[in-house]
């Protein structure tokens, strides 16, 4: 074979690329590679499916209710509404007792929960959250003992104030926790999830207090329940819009869709009942509060369930990365 023939064969792929629409970049011809279909790696997902079980969304709900209830308790106390303050404080303690039990059940052994307390890591949402939960439970317990039995007056009042300070972080840190994972539908909603969780927590705290408190004293609780429920609905819709149609797809089918629809219906109906009937009827207050509580729980379950299809289908991981790379490359060319 002649030298010229070898050179022709050597550069034939380059000529073929140029004939197919390749572009020169100063060093030769660069092939325009067609977009590849998103695939898994040898049949495996890019990400691992979350290993959390049913205890975790229940913990999201219980912890949020506890955290928001402590703030409601202190607000009612400062306003002189001791009946509402006591019942909100009891709701906070109930959530603080149930939450560690749910976490321990998910972890499998009590010593795993204890081991998370041995080292404090400010950069770990789980470590910070465990310490917040433990501290919250301790001070809320002291505050309840003081409120019920009148002992330790100074310590009791201080504990109630500290409980109210720790309440908002307890109600929202779980949103930071799941947003800190690599699950696309959680991570990409990291700006909106804390608002959704805060609103849901406020709604559930107000609803629980409205159920437990006599109608005449429950006005602030009803207003918190209604406002929280409406804000929750709005924040959840905002979260989906900012995710975009593609990333929010898991909310449009299966369990996430069913729970989300249920959350909308229950929260909306509960807010209406609480607003228009609960001011005069104890039965209506209980019914409206129960509907709002169920709606808040359903919202947490919807978010939890959406994480599974979002993590197992590789397109939700690969496509956003590809879009970011394309945007970066486009910016570099313009610069």
Residue locations for each model-derived region?
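Short amphipathic, positively biased membrane-proximal segments
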Residues: 1-335
